[in-house]
Each structure stands twice: as C-alpha cells, then as structure tokens.
Regions:
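Short, solvent-exposed segments of well-ordered alpha helices
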Residues: 9-12, 17, 21, 152, ...
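Short, flexible loop/turn elements at secondary-structure junctions
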Residues: 45, 144-147, 166, 174, ...
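Metalloprotease/metallohydrolase-associated module, dominated by Zn2+-dependent proteases
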Residues: 24, 28, 33-36, 41, ...
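N-terminal low-structure segments adjacent to metalloprotease catalytic domains
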Residues: 1-102, 255-272
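Short catalytic/ligand-binding loop motif for oxyanion handling, primarily in non-cytosolic enzymes
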Residues: 23, 39, 49, 169, ...
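Short acidic alpha-helical/loop segments enriched in Asp/Glu that coordinate divalent cations
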Residues: 174-187
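Active-site recognition of the HExxH zinc-binding catalytic motif
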Residues: 159-172
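Active-site scaffold of zinc-dependent metalloenzymes
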Residues: 80-162
Length: 272
C-alpha cells in the first residue's frame, strides 16, 4: 500500500505590515509579498520557534560551535545552557539561506542525527518549496508573537521583522548580496569592520564567518533602528558617521522594496 504524502503546508502571501500586525495562535507561514523568495515563519511562542530552529542556528552561525556537523540533542542542550540561555532565549529571530538549510539537513541525515518533529516539519516545508535543489536563492526568516515574552513588545516585533526581512533579501537577491559585500570592503574602514566584528561577537555570532559579518552589518547598521537592539556606539561609531554610511549605502543600493525602506528612513530624518 503506498504511503500517503504529508499534507501541503498552507502559505499566505502578506506585506510587511500585514505580517507585523498578525497575532499568531499557532505557527503561520507567510510568503513575503514584496519578494516571494522570502518565507516568514510567525511563531506563537519563543519555545516553539526555538525547538524548530535553534539547532540550525548553532550549525550556521553561533560562536564556539561546530559548523561542519549537526549537534545532537544533548550537545545542543549543553551549548544553550553554557551560554546562560534557554530554548526560548537562544535567539529572538532567525534567518537562513536555502543553501544553509539544505546543508543542515543533508549532514543531519549523513550523521544519523535524530531530529525533532518540528525540524522534520521544517524539512517537509522546504521540500515542498523545492529549496533542496542546487542553486536556489531564497531565505527563511522567523519571528515570535508580540507578548510571547516580556521583551517582545509590539515595537520589538516590528524591529525583529524588519531586521530579518533584510536578511531574507540578502539570501534571495544575489545582486543585493554582492552590493553589501563590496560596501563592506570599500566603504567601511578596517577599524570599522573590526568594531562591527567585535559587536557581533559579543552578540554571539561567529566572527570568523566573513559573509555572516557583512550580512549582519547591513541588517544592524542600515535597518535596525530600535535602540533596544542597536545603537551606533555598540559598534564604536558616532551617529554622524553611521548617518553618512547609511546615505552612501542608499545612494548605490539596487532598486527594490528594501531600497524604498531605507529611503523612507532618510526622508523621515530630513523631515525632522
């Protein structure tokens, strides 16, 4: 008797505003209206988010952890505790390229790592979307519901979403990713790049992964405007220097929805 295939994951197309205003009571999957190659997982709780994505986070970008193999349950629990975190606090939002997710699941299979049901559900979603094929340019991001934790206020949720969407654009738009890389090399000084690395290392990112550094640079310096998460002094930078970098970034940025976001910030600043 043939085995029945898993039911298709339902995905709704939504704008940034619609996603931000959504109040999930269970996991909801959105396709971002301005860039359909970005999928958004909207979780009702940080626990639910962590169970699905913390092992991927450890594999892709967390400092002090291996990026060439997948952690077992025991190793992941120990790594989370060693950093003084819990399943809920390990990450507030997640972002991954299709290629990184494909590599994670391929290694988990080759190493015979027992994955949680939530991780298996994620695998099914990615298979449904065709993300395990070679050369797919796409990005998966996540965020938790407002009120799911005292830190996740309405404004914090909006900031997390904007930050993670910029990562989604980086992963799904090779032209934008190349622009960010060139900007990192040519517009920031060596000292500024070092200061950004130091800031990101303090946040738990693996500063040895260069692409991670310039991807986070664009997300924090250009699109994270909530002082709860980033202020220029965190990267040893003045407000004036950051404003100069933001203006230069906008000037050469590829056309599209994310450029419009940065332009709106600049217009609002000029109007004040």
């Amino acid at each position: 008797m043939p085995v029945a295939s898993a039911p298709a994951v339902q995905i709704s197309t939504a704008t940034e505003t619609e996603i931000n205003e959504h109040a999930p009571t269970s996991l909801t999957v959105f396709r971002f209206a301005d860039n359909p190659r970005i999928l958004v997982l909207d979780f009702a709780s940080l626990h639910e988010q962590g169970k699905m994505l913390n092992r991927v986070a450890a594999f892709v970008e967390k400092a002090g952890l291996p990026h060439d193999r997948v952690l077992t349950d025991g190793e992941l629990d120990a790594a989370i505790r060693a950093q003084g975190d819990t399943v809920e606090t390990f990450y507030l939002g997640h972002d991954y390229a299709a290629a990184s997710l494909a590599r994670f699941f391929a290694l988990a299979d080759s190493e015979q790592i027992m994955l949680d049901p939530a991780e298996q559900w994620l695998r099914a979603l990615l298979q449904q979307e065709g993300w395990f094929a070679s050369g797919v340019a796409a990005g998966l991001i996540s965020l938790p519901a407002a009120g799911s934790d005292p830190r996740i206020t309405a404004s914090a949720r909006a900031a997390i979403l904007r930050h993670e969407l910029s990562h989604g654009e980086f992963f799904s738009n090779p032209e934008y990713a190349e622009y960010v890389y060139k900007f990192w090399l040519t517009e920031l000084t060596e000292d500024e790049r070092g200061a950004v690395r130091d800031f990101l290392a303090k946040e738990g990112y693996d500063a040895r992964v260069e692409e991670l550094m310039f991807n986070e640079m664009q997300a924090y310096l250009m699109f994270t405007r909530d002082p709860t998460f980033f202020t220029p002094d965190m990267a040893a930078m003045t407000h004036e220097r950051l404003a100069t970098l933001q203006a230069r970034f906008l000037a050469g940025m590829p056309a599209g929805w994310l450029r419009n976001v940065l332009a709106s910030y600049q217009s609002a600043a000029l109007a004040r």
